[in-house]
Each structure stands twice: as structure tokens, then as C-alpha cells.
Amino acid sequence: MRYLPHTPEEISEMLQAVGLSSLEELYSAIPKEARLTRPLSMEPSLDEASLMRHLEELAQKNRAGRMLSFLGAGAYEHHFPPAADQLLLRSEFYTAYTPYQPEVSQGTLQVIFEFQTIVSEILGLPIANASMYDGASALAEAVLMARRLTGRERTVLSGGVHPDYIGTVETYVHGIGAGKASLVGVDVGRDGTADVEALTRAIDETTACVVVGYPNFFGVVGDIRKVAEVCHQKGALLITVTLDPYALALLESPGALGADIAVAEGQPLGLPPQYGGPNVGLFACRNDRKYLQQVPGRLVGETVDKHGTRGYVLTLATREQHIRRERATSNICTNSGLCATAVTMRMCMLGKRGFVEAAKQCLAKAEHLKREIARLEGYSLPMSAPTFHEFVVKVRGGDAGKLTRALAEQGIIAGLDLGRIDARRRDELLVAVTERHSRADLDRLVAGLAGFTP
């Protein structure tokens, strides 16, 4: 919105309309001691060239872009084909909105349809929606969907689910009038995988769903088939959460292992990690009419027009739009359409072979780094289960926070200090590796860890 200052004539006219004679009279309700009686302490304005130099000087103070980062924990830096950046700027794509007159925008609808197809193939489930806000909101919506489908209220959450995702579920559940008592947490086993025996004990006749990470927050890959069997025996649904879908380029899909609903964070597939987003949530479920009617968000379907020409439409729109709020399966407004478009473009450019090759590089580099760290005195890998490209390290000296601060002085972000999330894990560091890390990057981290003095 433009800012146009009021003229003296306009100010006088407004004062007359409210029966006042001056601005002083207008502000009389504000105590004098609370008023600013001097000019603001601001430097004089700059011309454009001077302003650009000033901003460049400020930008130079930011070290983040020059740091070697091994952060993950839900946001990952992969290589994206740069051609998509230019394509996204085309006017027919550059909007976050699903079209208000959707059938007119066949190009946009086709892109969303292709996005749904990609999500369906990655998650291994036939029904995928047009995107969610992010992985956390996708999980929360999946939990609400499971409650509607089963008529039950209880949710069992494995300790391997991202803590922020659990917080989002708590917020959504509170929003529908249910309390935290309907959410039950179960710690992971000693090897880092979901504790099947503990989950089995936690599931009862009021349990709507069980949520497990695949891979989980600690990077661990567990066999979720056993969890699926227990869930289905007791009438509960299994929901899986994937933080980096690149893992599913190598692993069996959640759908093939028995998941009823699978959600994931789509940021790694085509969005650079930034402070606060933007992100995009992936959501897929079983091919069942009851599930289809309860899927949150929008669905794009393929059809033909009266001439027999293929076209795309919003399918079952009255399930989610055009009805009363309390009857809708969700209430997404401005959705992640542009982010979904970016993911679609970049995944199509990468291709299936490129997707698998990048995932193989992630795995190989992470395994190499694990071996090198395990050789260092004072370091160990506390979780014995397989991992993809993220893993937990028990650090020398028992203080991961101190280690991360020391390595930051060397220009290295060593990973996430897990003590910031759970005080019991203050001696553990969560490290993530992607195909963007070179052998020299890995060697630099190992050298930094080796030289750390508690």
C-alpha cells in the first residue's frame, strides 16, 4: 500500500469532522510525559548509491553465508537446478494462490497435478493433495483426519517425531477442543528406532493413530512394518513423517510398508533453507473413498471437456471449499502453491535418476563421516540402527553446546546441539550431510572435532 502524507487542508478537514480545533487537542488524552517532543534520532537520508553501499556493508557482517554448515533437523540444503528460478518468475506461475477460477488456469492446474503425481510416487500412496503449509501442519492435519476417520481421539507419538511437529499437533488438537491428554508420547528405543513394544502397550481401543518418523528426527531408519501390523490389529491408523524425502529415493516407500497416511516436508525437494520458510507440506493417503472425502487441502483431478480434450479441475471442492468452516476438512487459504510449483519444476529437471544419485551421495558421504568421527577419541555414535544422511554423535567432554560454539569460531556449524531440545541429550550433536558437502568439507569438520578441547 502506498504512503501519501496528509496535506494541511486534509488535516484541518478531518479535525473539523470530529469537532476539534487542533492536533494538540487531538493528542490531549496522551500524557505529556509519554509524548516525544524532539525529532527522532535518525541519520539523514541517503541517496540510492550511498544506500546500496551502506546495505552491502551491513550484509558483510553476516557470517552465515560463509559458514560450513552441517545443520539439518528438518531443513536441508540440496542442489537445485537453477533454471527453475527463472521459470518461476513467469507471470502465470508467480502466485501463492490456487486460482479462484481454476478451470481457466489449465497450466497451473496441470503443474499441481504433476506435483501430486510426484508426491504420490515418493510416498507410495495413491491419493496426494495439492500441498500443505509445511511438514508440521501436514502432520497435524493427518492426525485430525485420523480422528475423523476412526471416531477415536487418542494419538500416540513416537519420540522420534520432530519436537516442533509435536508442538504443532498440540496446537491443532487444542484448537478443536481436545487437550494434551489425548496425545501420548513414547520414547525411542536405545538403538534410536521406534520402540514397538512400548508403542504396542500405548495403543488402546481409543487410539486413532500412531505417528512415527521415517527416517526419524535422529536420522534413524527403522522397520515400520511391525508398527503398522500392531496399529491395524488394534484398529488404529499409522501415520509416517519424513523430514527429507531424499531418503525415500533409496528406502521402501511408507505406503509399501503399511502406512495409511504419509506426510513429509517438501523443502528439501526444491526450496532453499531460509529463516522461517517458505516451506511446503506433502500429504498422501490410501486409495479409499472414505479417505478421499476427508483429505485436507485441495485436490486437482484430470477429466475431459465436452470435446473430449483432456483438462484439469479442482476435484471434490465442496469437501474443502464453499462450505461452512466447521464442516470443512481444513481451512487452508493462501497455500503453498508457488512452493509446490518450485518443487515440481526442480524435481522434473533432476529426474528419477538424478534423485536417486543425489540420495546415494548423501548416504555415502554420511557413512564416511560416521566412520571418521567414530575413530576420534572421546566421540561415539550412540544409536546403532541404520541412518540415511543424518546421525547423532556423543561428543567429547559431554557438552555439545560448548563444542558448537568453539567450532563456530572456526567457521563451522557442526550440527544441532540436542541439549537445546532435551536436557538429557546435552552431550549429543545431530549432524546432517548432503550431496553438496565435498570431501574437503567432511575432513574440515573431522579436524575441528579432533582439535576440540572441552
From Swiss-Prot:
Domain of life: Bacteria
The protein, known as: Probable glycine dehydrogenase (decarboxylating) subunit 1
Family to which the UniProt record says this protein belongs: Belongs to the GcvP family. N-terminal subunit subfamily.
Quaternary structure and interacting proteins, as annotated: The glycine cleavage system is composed of four proteins: P, T, L and H. In this organism, the P 'protein' is a heterodimer of two subunits.
Function summary: The glycine cleavage system catalyzes the degradation of glycine. The P protein binds the alpha-amino group of glycine through its pyridoxal phosphate cofactor; CO(2) is released and the remaining methylamine moiety is then transferred to the lipoamide cofactor of the H protein.
GO biological process terms on file: glycine decarboxylation via glycine cleavage system; nucleoside metabolic process
Keywords: Oxidoreductase
Organism: Sorangium cellulosum (strain So ce56)
Keyword Disulfide bond carried by entry: no
A Pfam family annotated for this UniProt entry: GDC-P
Catalyzed chemical reaction(s): N(6)-[(R)-lipoyl]-L-lysyl-[glycine-cleavage complex H protein] + glycine + H(+) = N(6)-[(R)-S(8)-aminomethyldihydrolipoyl]-L-lysyl-[glycine-cleavage complex H protein] + CO2
InterPro entries linked: GcvPA, GDC-P_N, GDC_P, PyrdxlP-dep_Trfase, PyrdxlP-dep_Trfase_major, PyrdxlP-dep_Trfase_small
GO molecular function: glycine dehydrogenase (decarboxylating) activity
